[in-house]
Amino acid sequence: MDDSKTNGRQNASRIVALANTIQKSVAELQAVLDSKGLPAPSFAEDASPDPLPFEAQKAQDAVLDATAELHDILLEPTALVLKTISNEYVAFLGFISRYDIPNFVPLGGRVSFTDIAKKTGFEEGIVKRLLRAAICRRIFQEPESGYVAHTKASKAMRSKILLTFLRTGADMGWYTIFKLVDAAEKWPDVQEQDQTAFNLAHDVQGTYFENVAKSAKNAELFASGMATQWELPGYELHHLLDGYDWTGLGKAKVIDVGGFRGRISIALAERFPDLDLLVQDMEMNEADAHAAVPSALKDRVHFMSRDIFTTQPVRADVYYIRQIFHDWSDKYCTKLLRAHTSQLEAGSSVLIHDCILPEVPGSSLPLWKERDMRAMDLGLVAHMNGRERSVDEWHKLVTEADPRFKIRQISQPEGSMLALIEVVFNA
């Protein structure tokens, strides 16, 4: 049998199957929108910035994965490889965020490349090239030759938090990844936070966090990045508030390990009046942090400056740890877990709130979401030798910390990008 003919028929069947999936799933998605009286998605400036309704998410996942696969399968091999080279993002997003172009372009109006060049001091030709690269990615539009107007994406970038997040990536983050292979060659152990692509790219000593802390500007950029992620679809706090039986704890003490400025603890205290919260983080100004807590919650939300890798001095019912493990290599994550053994007793637990990578690409997540998670994973190793982990890797990690640690359960609320991993200690 001619293998080329067989493969051709299989590919033909696949592209037809993908087209059918797209047609069926778009119809399902549109039916949800119609039932709720919602407009169809568009790139228009006045399009809704809200995520699609929860009921439409499965159809959305199917459409996005199928359209991406159909696009890729129709490319020749060389084009498929080369389309992954996206260095131009660093250039045009760096320009847009540094010079606050989204807030220079008026809502409902337009501005000329000439005016943008005058505002920024750039030569008009380079302004056109940068912004037209962005326009090809649906960021801004050119409704008339020589003029720039908003799309829903560029309008969203008027947000100070999002724009600052992009500025962080452009100024500090994205080109760090270019040194990842060099760093892995130089430090093959991939464990220490001061032996990373970040160190090579910026020619600095010390860890990423230590370097961020040296500059008030960089510290604020980092804080904005954190705030941005909490608003991304799949990372919202309601997944935590609704996804765990906090009420079932009764009157309980919860320690928010590595809780930064206490946003999560404040949200928990607002929803669950029986919880007493203590936020622990390194080099924290306890008084300043507590001053920002709403007055009605001040007696239940407290702060403690503490090196989270040293022995835990406070007993609690739950030690909640959100997206801290992914900042660290296994060497330090096992140390973090061991720091809690002296305080864990029957009924208490460590509640890890973090990503779970599929064991094999495409096996348990829509691929469009997994791509983002894999990108995050590489960003973590580039900056701090952190990592995302699969279920098997989580089990291995807790056992390596101490064989008496066991994962009691893993749950992932529908629509959440983070799983709740409940770890107990069988003393």
From Swiss-Prot:
InterPro entries: COMT-like (IPR016461), O_MeTrfase_dom (IPR001077), SAM-dependent_MTases_sf (IPR029063), WH-like_DNA-bd_sf (IPR036388), WH_DNA-bd_sf (IPR036390)
This protein's record includes keyword Transferase: yes
Keyword Amino-acid biosynthesis: no
Cofactor: S-adenosyl-L-methionine
Coiled-coil features, chain-numbered ranges: none
Secretion signal, residue range per the UniProt entry: none
Biophysicochemical property: temperature dependence: Optimum temperature is 35 degrees Celsius.
Protein purpose: O-methyltransferase; part of the 2 gene clusters that mediate the biosynthesis of fusicoccins, diterpene glucosides that display phytohormone-like activity and function as potent activators of plasma membrane H(+)-ATPases in plants by modifying 14-3-3 proteins and cause the plant disease constriction canker.
Name of the protein in its database record: O-methyltransferase PaMT
Species for this entry: Phomopsis amygdali
